[in-house]
Amino acid sequence: MDHLPIFCQLRDRDCLIVGGGDVAERKARLLLEAGARLTINALTFIPQFTVWANEGMLTLVEGPFDETLLDSCWLAIAATDDDTVNQRVSDAAESRRIFCNVVDAPKAASFIMPSIIDRSPLMVAVSSGGTSPVLARLLREKLESLLPQHLGQVARYAGQLRARVKKQFATMGERRRFWEKFFVNDRLAQSLANADEKAVNATTERLFSEPLDHRGEVVLVGAGPGDAGLLTLKGLQQIQQADIVVYDRLVSDDIMNLVRRDADRVFVGKRAGYHCVPQEEINQILLREAQKGKRVVRLKGGDPFIFGRGGEELETLCHAGIPFSVVPGITAASGCSAYSGIPLTHRDYAQSVRLVTGHLKTGGELDWENLAAEKQTLVFYMGLNQAATIQEKLIAFGMQADMPVALVENGTSVKQRVVHGVLTQLGELAQQVESPALIIVGRVVGLRDKLNWFSNY
């Protein structure tokens, strides 16, 4: 270990930054957030320093480096564009046994600045020891996506409850189980973020009163249309916290690779026409695992409330009194159309969009007359096997035979393929693609050649 990670208490303590440019400004911002009494010594200053000085937030000392400014300091930073000056600052600080950071010169510094994730009072610091700041930044960005913004509020509130937890729960094991429930309770976190004191108190009392081995919960998470980058931050956080993930065939391998490593995984293989596990059995899996006290994530492709049968699954849980929540996802219509260069609405061509299932219950029938109307875009989910019927019905109810159509296979993924033509060719085009695929019908499809961007990468 080349460096010892420590967190410094700088509030109301004198610190010095030598340099008045953009880099110095970034360092100053961090020290000000930490509550330091800050002096800036430089030949010239960018405007932000003048603003801060006028507000009484720091002191400016114009002129060459004055090492006597270090005499009362706890910490110094050399942030000029002159290596000689930076080395002088480092040497002067070293002689006074003051920790000094030298920007872009870790060997000349007695401490280095990490990349910081601030969820005060929770702080996470990432460092490459000065060898690769870009790598540290990339890791910080990844960690940022895993840590909810409201985590700091939850941590502060936890501090207020520590004495009560210690009094109510006699053993370390009981306290650990309580805190595990506490920190993954989405309702509590949201109530704290909304400053809803009544809801916070109600949720807290419920956490204290329910048995530690209480029933678990189910989180219905939309995985998006395929590209792992389209998974929402909240969705990512949920699959990282899951004890068990129940997932469909439409959830990509890239997304499953983001699931917590020690979480159990149950594949139920649902896709239009390929039901590996009956819906009722899926409902029972969710119920059974939640009743064991597990945190269950039901991971579905797209959005769980748009042709995902999410409502049916939650009705079962609701009837059994199992707590649940829903994390929306980017639905396939939105993702696939965007990655195909097909806007779903456009002032000149479509004032509305209809999301339509091509997989009806036995005896069901669509409202073909309204679907055939002008100035709208139709997106058919699970319609591949019904493409010929869709073509026939739309033409029969008055849609123009030359209406542009597109079929998007494996949308938003590296395997995406788009075939397009006109309505009279829809049945034939459907023979050229495989599920999962969407059918898009409307004049907006004609914009694809101009707006297509994804196939260029």
Swiss-Prot record:
NAD(+) binds at D22, V23, L43, T44. The keyword Endoplasmic reticulum does not apply. InterPro entries: 4pyrrol_Mease, 4pyrrol_Methylase_sf, 4pyrrole_Mease_sub1, 4pyrrole_Mease_sub2, CobA/CysG_C, NAD(P)-bd_dom_sf, Siro_Cobalamin_biosynth, Sirohaem_synt_dimer_dom_sf. GO terms for biological process: cobalamin biosynthetic process; methylation; siroheme biosynthetic process. Residues 216-457 are annotated as: Uroporphyrinogen-III C-methyltransferase. S-adenosyl-L-methionine binds at P225, G301, G302, D303, I306, T331, A332, M382, G411. SUPFAM superfamilies: NAD(P)-binding Rossmann-fold domains, Siroheme synthase middle domains-like, Tetrapyrrole methylase. HAMAP family: Siroheme_synth. In the N-terminal section; belongs to the precorrin-2 dehydrogenase / sirohydrochlorin ferrochelatase family. In the C-terminal section; belongs to the precorrin methyltransferase family. This is Siroheme synthase. The gene is cysG.
